[in-house]
């Protein structure tokens, strides 16, 4: 099937300075997957990122963490699609979203960047908005629009608080389940579960 999931990309910024920040929750999801499933990432310079493989046969996935910094993520994703011979429809991008409460997920088969520089770069390099993305809620820094704008950078580049960590753990588990469901069921059926995902703490 042409639209079978083949490549999962977690967006984030490389380096210890950004480890554990809200903007890096895409990286965090793939790192947790690697830890649980017992595989590791390796540097692949031609793809400008860290790459891993998981599964066999029809369930085999390539996983990518671009090392280009968020604003140039699309360069790494374009290189990976070309190298492996995949189409944008066979891609899933894991991306943080400030417009979604922490603990919630939103799956979309296509769409605009929504103000996210990593998605903007991906759209530019792929030449299309038609690729699946899993938006992972990180919550907003404030309800007031002016205060929210003023605190956006410090919020996304800040770390999750100790109080938020239990919800982070739950949503990362949800991301891994979401990937498995997309593999088994496809985007539409999996989306029903993913878009309804809501830990009790955020209901």
From Swiss-Prot:
Keyword Phosphoprotein among UniProt keywords: no
Gene Ontology molecular function terms on file: peptidyl-tRNA hydrolase activity; tRNA binding
Enzyme class: hydrolase
Feature type site, description Discriminates between blocked and unblocked aminoacyl-tRNA: 13
Assigned EC number: 3.1.1.29
Keyword vocabulary terms for this entry: Cytoplasm, Hydrolase, RNA-binding, tRNA-binding
Active site: 23 (proton acceptor)
GO cellular component: cytoplasm
Top-rank taxon, per record: Bacteria
Catalytic activity: an N-acyl-L-alpha-aminoacyl-tRNA + H2O = an N-acyl-L-amino acid + a tRNA + H(+)
Gene3D superfamilies for the chain: Peptidyl-tRNA hydrolase (3.40.50.1470)
Compartment(s) of residence: Cytoplasm
GO biological process annotation, one example: protein quality control for misfolded or incompletely synthesized proteins
UniProt entry tagged with the keyword Membrane: no
Pfam families: Pept_tRNA_hydro
Sites annotated Stabilizes the basic form of H active site to accept a proton: 96
Binding site for tRNA: 18, 69, 71, 117
Function: Hydrolyzes ribosome-free peptidyl-tRNAs (with 1 or more amino acids incorporated), which drop off the ribosome during protein synthesis, or as a result of ribosome stalling.
Subunit structure: Monomer.
Family assignment from sequence similarity: Belongs to the PTH family.
Full protein name: Peptidyl-tRNA hydrolase
Organism in which the protein naturally occurs: Parasynechococcus marenigrum (strain WH8102)
Upper classification of the organism: Bacteria, Bacillati, Cyanobacteriota, Cyanophyceae, Synechococcales
């Amino acid at each position: 099937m042409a639209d079978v999931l083949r490549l999962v990309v977690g967006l984030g910024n490389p380096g210890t300075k950004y480890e554990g920040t809200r903007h890096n929750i895409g990286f965090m999801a793939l790192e947790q997957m690697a830890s649980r499933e017992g595989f590791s990432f390796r540097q692949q310079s031609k793809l400008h990122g860290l790459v891993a493989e998981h599964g066999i046969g029809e369930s085999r996935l390539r996983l990518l963490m671009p090392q280009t910094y968020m604003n140039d993520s699309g360069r790494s994703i374009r290189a990976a699609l070309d190298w492996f011979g995949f189409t944008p429809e066979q891609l899933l991008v894991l991306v943080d979203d400030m417009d979604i409460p922490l603990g919630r997920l939103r799956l979309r088969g296509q769409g605009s960047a929504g103000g996210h520089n990593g998605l903007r770069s991906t759209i530019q390099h792929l030449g299309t908005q038609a690729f699946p993305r899993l938006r992972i809620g990180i919550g907003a820094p404030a309800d007031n629009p002016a205060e929210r704008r003023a605190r956006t950078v410090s919020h996304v580049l800040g770390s999750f608080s100790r109080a938020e960590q239990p919800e982070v753990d739950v949503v990362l588990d949800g991301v891994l389940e979401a990937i498995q469901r997309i593999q088994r069921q496809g985007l539409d059926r999996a989306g029903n579960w993913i878009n309804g995902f809501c830990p009790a703490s955020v209901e």
